[in-house]
């Protein structure tokens, strides 16, 4: 060791997305990852890379220097209560939408940056690449009660609806929609979509276990 540089700027918050090049942190935005980024896990003294960052949780403190995240310290254990699921287009062909249309029978709270507004019950909200709300970054939709219908998608059961919250983001390729929901509520939706409810109860239980295990792994 010929020298030590102390880096004291720390950013903490729920991770909304991560890639090889950047990490998006709630309340802070997207920050570039240093090419030599490493993460130290205090619980088991492991050193890992960006692929070990868990999206949807605030488990680590990110060390920032010169506008880039150069490292992170994971100091909290994972207690997986929620799951974040990217919603695909009709036919599950793509993750990018040209337009995203939502509606909630109870109305919604729409959060854009530091601002928010409410929609009336049954009111439709439309997002496209020209929507000015995207200037504030990621948009969050919260139903006042019940679920939110995603009218831009058609499934075998018709127009799908989602509990929890919906996040809408604009990328160069199009609009990406993410549903954050409790694990158990997610399983209530995914298991019936994977096998008929008329199947034997034990078979349904096995499918629920498989779906839960897959969700935790992902």
Model-derived features: positions:
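Conserved, single-site charged/polar hotspot
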Residues: 1-218
